[in-house]
C-alpha cells in the first residue's frame, strides 16, 4: 500500500532517513504501485527539503499534461 494517499494516479513511497538507497526505494514503489499508478519516492533528510524521485517517462507524462493546462 502507498504511504501517502490523495494524489490520484501516483503511488507514493515516503522515506525520512539520513541514508537512502533510492534504487531500492524506487523498486519498492514500482512493485507496490497499482496498474496506471506512477511510482514515486518522496524522501528527505533532517533539516533538508523534501525531494521527489520518479522515472523520467512518468515525469514527462506529468509535464505534458500540465502544459495542456497552461
What are these model-predicted stretches?
Residues 1-32:
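Catalytic centers of nucleases
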Residues 20-50:
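Mid-chain, well-packed structural core segment of small domains
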Residues 38-70:
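Domain-level recognition of nuclease-like catalytic cores that cleave nucleotide substrates
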Residues 5-11, 32-39, 65-70:
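Solvent-exposed, well-ordered amphipathic alpha-helical segments
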Amino acid at each position: 500500500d502507498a504511504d501517502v494517499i490523495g494524489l490520484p494516479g501516483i503511488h507514493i513511497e515516503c522515506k525520512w532517513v539520513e541514508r537512502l538507497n533510492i534504487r531500492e526505494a524506487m523498486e519498492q514503489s514500482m512493485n507496490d504501485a497499482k496498474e496506471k499508478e506512477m511510482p514515486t519516492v518522496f524522501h528527505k533528510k533532517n533539516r533538508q527539503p523534501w525531494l521527489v524521485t520518479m522515472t523520467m517517462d512518468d515525469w514527462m507524462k506529468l509535464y505534458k499534461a500540465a502544459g495542456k493546462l497552461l
